[in-house]
Amino acid sequence: MSDYKHTLNLPETEFPMRGNLAQREPKMLQDWTNKALYHKIRAAKKGKTPFILHDGPPYANGDIHIGHAVNKILKDVIVKSKTLSDFDSPYVPGWDCHGLPIELMVEKKVGKPGKKVTAAEFRQKCRDYAEKQINGQKADFIRLGVLGEWDKPYRTMDFSSEANIIRELGNVVRSGHLEKGFKPVHWCTDCGSALAEAEVEYQDKVSPSIDVRFNIADEASFTKQFTAIGEGLGEGTISVVIWTTTPWTLPANRAVSLHPELEYSLVQVQSENGNERLVVATDLLDECVKRFGFENTHVLGTALGQALENMQVQHPFYDFTVPLILGEHVTTDSGTGCVHTAPGHGVEDFNVGRQYNLEVANPVGANGVYLENTPIFAGEHVFKANEHVVEVLAERGALVHHVKYTHSYPHCWRHKTPLIFRATPQWFISMDKNGLRAASIKEIHKTQWIPEWGESRIESMVAGRPDWCISRQRTWGVPIALFVHKDTGDLHPNTDALIEQVAQRVESEGIQAWWDIDPQEMLGDDADTFVKVLDTLDVWFDSGVSHYFVVDKRDDIPASADLYLEGSDQHRGWFMSSLMTSVATKGHAPYKQVLTHGFTVDGKGKKMSKSLGNTVAPQQVTNKLGADILRLWVASTDYRSEIAVSDEILKRSADAYRRIRNTSRFLLANLTGFNPKTDLVPFEEMVELDKWAVSRAHTMQREIVKAYEAYDLLVVTQKLMQFCSIEMGSFYLDIIKDRQYTAKSDSHARRSCQSALYHIVEALVRWMAPITSFTAQEIWQEMPWQEDEFVFTGTWYTGLTAQADNTEFNDAFWQQVLAVKDEVNRTIELARKEGTIGGSLEAEVKIYATAELAELLSKLQDEARFVFITSSATVEAVESKPADATETEVPGLWLHISASEGKKCARCWHHREDVGTNESHPELCQRCVTNVDGEGETRAYA
């Protein structure tokens, strides 16, 4: 038996079947670094239309987690896709470096500043710690295949950044949005500092729920305001009843608030105190009576809240009276409709108190302990004092009702401990003084939010948020570099110039310069009347002004930011702080689009935590499976909602990756010996099936690029998989194997096929590049005709051609053929299982079809057998179908499979009756004889 293997065009490539990504990727990264890939991209795109994705800085503390990996991969995919769309899209990664978490880590090592180390030494230790953390995180981000300005990132602790943060503070001052105030702020007693809105988490907390009597001081005057119902206005002490879940704030009570338009009822009740009269909102009366457990109650009279304004009530345990005041914040959602008001412990209380010039009492220290001059409760921690307050109320007959109550309560994001509202002298960016709130909302509406619900979410947050407290009482932070008058607290009249002088010092010496500056040196004679502010800036201000010191200031960023991309928690964090500072100083939003992704959860949808043991470390995934698997997983998810990850989910991504890799390998292996400069067949001269494949790639590229532009990576990966697995793997590539392997090596039939494969791999490698970056570059290196060294420096492939819809062999034609082929495959598989045939090349298929379908399939003529991968395929009228023909799911199509009576060709394995008709090649069919010794077969259709 002769060996015809040498006459076949067998696939050949050095591109391995197995990715071995964990071993191969680090070597590729080293090569990219050595060859300055990122800077080559920048050079290639210089002068192109800019697209700026501004990086929200991760915090420089700890190893990166899977959420960090998702965020950085998404950004990298988008930047690379924009680069392929021929934008100049630099990526400057950043880090957030100041603040409490780093202070706490350094405190563990060296103690608090001022004890074992000076404040200056402590700041340097913090800087050193952040530097080390950044280096670790940077290595992990680079390992993910993220390209960027890694040798020159932005860091909020860089001297230039610190200086520009101070300059932007000066711009806020100049725009008139900065205020100093004694206001209630979220305060963490563990941090000993105010917290920003973004640093507050809400968790369930069990608190005392109490209703408390405030006795009326002048009952005669009070009852005159009520319209009687029936005879008289009853008997017994009169009390206004308030409801609260923060008994510890009662020492600071300075009023009871009523709603001016609400009706209040004077109610006769019998209690443990005997006959008494209580005042509650009429709308809440039934609920209150039920809660209090009183019997024999009836309404004596009613009055509007506005009629009771300025009436005095007795504080429940201190020897002074407080007024009844009016406030629009009072509701009938719960409670009694009479609101305990402590201006030092609540924003609404503070605001309404200011209208009545109430004292802003603040009897609580920074550590959460009542001050020494606080009657009854001095020295007690507020949360421990709750029960003591309840006891005192009960002893004095002021307690109406008391139960335990579970409710959502603000907690410190770092310590996970309950917060208090505490009035302290702080610096604020005013939301309303100069119209910042309204201007910010206007800019929100000009921005594109993806998903769309982000717009209403951040709008409601901005609409309802308090003034932004930007001051902190910390050591490691950018200073609020202001001089204020000792007595009045007013800013120095030369503040603009002073801020610039400080910024210049900080630019060369870092933030320590502020604490080292002698006021005399800068202020001269004014040093006696003006003092330095020693507070530091909220770290959300640091990162929130990165639009100023990164996007506006850096030479390698050519324009304002097009896109911010972070987790959905950043609506109340970085998106908001960036918006407010940009609108305050520049009058517009810092971004054109804002895209958010969800949080990672485990395979069962549960939140990830170390305690549950369900975390997935990106480092372990890259070390085991490779970064491309992680990148493909990220792109394959609907990342705008929760993102599930588990070993099983990653395994599915690895399986999908193998299908893409195998398709790529087939393309490369069958381009051996092909030179596009000499062998490329023009589109119009190609075999019809090859035209279709190129045209499908053209359509697919249009859809994929559109999906990239919409940041819809799930659609990109779905299209990739559809193209590789179905349209190529199960159809086109399956069909062309015979022609590719058996046709004469330089024949038109084979060169047409190779030309299609060439166009397809040129397009496919670029579609893949933003997502499976390492594999795309690996493929690129196996394409010897490429002039560019890297796939990332070019653009989408422009050599694809679309087949016109009005042509005979258009996409609709081939889609119909594909549907018939699926039915043929299914029917052959049934025949194989029944033992009628072995493989498909042993089969003869007779296709019985209705007139229209039969006419369509007949266009393939004798080449239909190559499409169906059978030794024979004939098309006949449906009327002639035999009784044992198989009906299919394609309307009007029946199939009949039988074993071929022809002999098996030793070269192409088709069973043909003409095998052995050539004496020189008795084991070959006539087609193979032509391909071996003759001019080679011709193909027109497949």
From Swiss-Prot:
Keywords attached to this entry: Aminoacyl-tRNA synthetase, ATP-binding, Cytoplasm, Ligase, Metal-binding, Nucleotide-binding, Protein biosynthesis, Zinc
UniProt binding sites for L-isoleucyl-5'-AMP: E566
Main location (coarse class): cytoplasm
Binding site for Zn(2+): C905, C908, C925, C928
Obligatory cofactor(s): Zn(2+)
Domain of life: Bacteria
EC number of this enzyme: 6.1.1.5
Catalytic activities: tRNA(Ile) + L-isoleucine + ATP = L-isoleucyl-tRNA(Ile) + AMP + diphosphate
CDD domains found in the cross-reference section: Anticodon_Ia_Ile_BEm
Motif interval(s): 'HIGH' region: 58-68
GO biological process, one term: isoleucyl-tRNA aminoacylation
InterPro entries reported for this sequence: aa-tRNA-synth_I_CS, aa-tRNA-synth_Ia, Anticodon_Ile_BEm, Ile-tRNA-ligase, Ile-tRNA-ligase_type1, Ile-tRNA_ligase, M/V/L/I-tRNA-synth_anticd-bd, Rossmann-like_a/b/a_fold
Broad EC category: ligase
MF terms in GO: aminoacyl-tRNA deacylase activity; ATP binding; isoleucine-tRNA ligase activity; tRNA binding; zinc ion binding
Quaternary state and interactors: Monomer.
Family, as annotated: Belongs to the class-I aminoacyl-tRNA synthetase family. IleS type 1 subfamily.
Cross-referenced HAMAP family: Ile_tRNA_synth_type1
Domain-level remarks: IleRS has two distinct active sites: one for aminoacylation and one for editing. The misactivated valine is translocated from the active site to the editing site, which sterically excludes the correctly activated isoleucine. The single editing site contains two valyl binding pockets, one specific for each substrate (Val-AMP or Val-tRNA(Ile)).
Function: Catalyzes the attachment of isoleucine to tRNA(Ile). As IleRS can inadvertently accommodate and process structurally similar amino acids such as valine, to avoid such errors it has two additional distinct tRNA(Ile)-dependent editing activities. One activity is designated as 'pretransfer' editing and involves the hydrolysis of activated Val-AMP. The other activity is designated 'posttransfer' editing and involves deacylation of mischarged Val-tRNA(Ile).
Protein name: Isoleucine--tRNA ligase
The organism of origin for this protein: Pseudoalteromonas atlantica (strain T6c / ATCC BAA-1087)
Lineage: Bacteria, Pseudomonadati, Pseudomonadota, Gammaproteobacteria, Alteromonadales
Gene behind this protein: ileS
